[in-house]
């Protein structure tokens, strides 16, 4: 009984982590900002969003800087000091790979408070 409860809790956590979040357009503070700054506010936010996220293979410091749900900032060894890059790992067995990618997405979600 305890194992089935644990499996249900894990599957619910994975489902919640992968569920797309909704963004409510036009909140009060965003509307005030747009009125004060005019067209520059939206352009600045769009440019900032493009520049902040990194692609695979680019150097990083935190998980939340990398683009993609299961792309994490991993240490790459080969020099004297480790270099951190945005990386994704794949497993050869598809069922295990799906579980591993969900685990990485949860890990990224848990560490996202550092970038805010």
Swiss-Prot record:
GO function terms (MF aspect): toxin activity
Propeptide, chain numbering: 18-50
Processing and modification events after translation: Contains 3 disulfide bonds.
Top-rank taxon: Eukaryota
Tissues showing expression: Expressed by the venom gland.
Subcellular localization(s) per the UniProt record: Secreted
Listed GO CC annotations: extracellular region
N-terminal signal peptide: 1-17
Family statement: Belongs to the neurotoxin 25 family. F7 subfamily.
High-level lineage: Eukaryota, Metazoa, Ecdysozoa, Arthropoda, Chelicerata
Keywords, alphabetical: Disulfide bond, Secreted, Signal, Toxin
Protein name: U3-theraphotoxin-Lsp1a
């Amino acid at each position: 009984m305890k194992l089935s409860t644990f499996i249900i809790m894990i599957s619910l956590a994975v489902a919640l982590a992968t569920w797309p979040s909704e963004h409510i357009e036009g909140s009060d503070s965003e509307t005030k900002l747009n009125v004060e700054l005019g067209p520059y506010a939206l352009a600045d936010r769009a440019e900032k969003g493009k520049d902040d996220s990194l692609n695979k293979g680019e150097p990083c410091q935190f998980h939340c800087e990398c683009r993609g749900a299961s792309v994490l900032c991993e240490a790459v060894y080969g020099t004297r000091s480790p270099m951190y890059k945005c990386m994704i790992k794949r497993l050869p067995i598809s069922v295990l790979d799906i579980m591993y990618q969900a685990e990485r997405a949860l890990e990224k979600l848990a560490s996202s408070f550092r970038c805010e």
